Each structure stands twice: as C-alpha cells, then as structure tokens.
C-alpha cells in the first residue's frame, strides 16, 4: 500500500533519532490514554460490561507501558503529554476524535445506549485495525530490541481484541458487511490527513529542547 511505504520511510527517520523516537513512543502512549479516557467518559455505569471495562484497563496499561519506554529512551522530560514531547500529538488526537464523532453521528437515529455501544465498537474496530498495521511496521523497523519485544506482546493483545470486537459487530449490526467498508473509507481518509501532517513535521524537524538520556 502506498501509505505503508510512506510510513516505513518516516519510521526509519524516527527510530534513527532518539529524541524523535521518544516523542513517537509518547504519542502512542497518549493515544492509548485518549482511548482509555474516552471509554470511561462514554460508558454509563449501568451498561458497563466486564468486556468494556477490561478493554479500558488494557488501554490504560498500554499507555503506561509505552510511557515508560518513552521516558527510558528520552529521559524525565518525557514524563508528560506536553506538546513538545509528542510527535504530531494534536493531529493524532484529531484523527481519533474525528473518527469517534463520525461513528457517533452515524448512529444518531438509534437509542442512546445502542448508539453508544455501536459507536464504541466501530471506533475500536477501526482504530485497532490501524494500530496493528502501524505497530507492525514499527516493530519490523526495530529488529531484536526491548521495544520490539514489548510491542510483540501489545500486538498479540490488540489482535485478540480486534477479533472479539469484530465478532461482536457482526452479531450486533446486520449491516456490518456494507457499513464497515464505508467506515473504513472514512478512517483511511482521516489517517491520510495525519500521515501528511507527520510527513510535513518530519521534513521541518529541528532538535527538540528536551534532554535525551544517553
């Protein structure tokens, strides 16, 4: 895929620079945190299932693990989500929030609980499909390293959860086979916007004023 080829080149540039690499990891951590936060904010306690609570805990654990890797690589200056220690953090969150808004609006005619459940399920399915692709390319660029090994565990969990959420969607939405293609197209367009922003940012990159651990 053209976008994969583009991302491979960007990842090569990122992992060659410890400061950029730490920001990259921190941005992944931030997105996992955004997912964790959104699950807790969107789900009413009365309908919060063990599966959804488990997913929230998984997102929080991934956010923490990636944060620790960012701090280990970049130093204490990366122990926050300040804009200067993220890599296109605003654009990455916009991808997530815009996708969430699209899915929510797509089910505006449903009951409140069904709308929340379907929007959550589709956003999760779309984001985890993308995450598996991006994390997979990233892991391939790392060789046999601590970060690659930790990503392997994360990928295994994401793969299992993607399978579970897809089975849930196929059972809950009779229109899944057609709706999923429409939603994939929207997600891909939003991802391309983020990828363009990342390409531009790396082309203009100058050293970040953060002490990087030696």
Question: Where are the predicted features?
Answer:
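Non-heme di-metal
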Residues: 1-214
């Amino acid at each position: 895929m053209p976008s994969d080829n583009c991302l491979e080149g960007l990842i090569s540039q990122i992992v060659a620079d410890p400061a950029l690499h730490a920001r990259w990891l921190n941005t992944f951590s931030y997105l996992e945190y955004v997912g964790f936060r959104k699950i807790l904010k969107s789900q009413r306690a009365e309908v919060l299932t063990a599966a959804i609570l488990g997913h929230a805990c998984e997102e929080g654990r991934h956010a923490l693990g990636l944060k620790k890797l960012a701090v280990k690589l970049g130093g204490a200056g990366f122990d926050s989500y300040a804009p200067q220690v993220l890599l296109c953090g605003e654009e990455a969150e916009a991808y997530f929030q815009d996708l969430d808004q699209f899915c929510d609006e797509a089910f505006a005619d449903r009951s409140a609980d069904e709308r929340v459940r379907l929007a959550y399920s589709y956003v999760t399915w779309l984001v985890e499909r993308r995450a598996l692709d991006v994390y997979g390319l990233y892991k391939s660029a790392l060789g046999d390293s601590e970060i690659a090994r930790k990503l392997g565990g994360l990928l295994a969990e994401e793969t299992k959860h993607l399978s579970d959420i897809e089975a849930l969607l196929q059972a809950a939405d009779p229109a899944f086979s057609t709706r999923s293609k429409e939603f994939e197209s929207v997600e891909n367009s939003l991802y391309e916007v983020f990828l363009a922003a990342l390409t531009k940012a790396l082309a203009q990159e100058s050293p970040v004023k953060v002490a990087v651990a030696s």
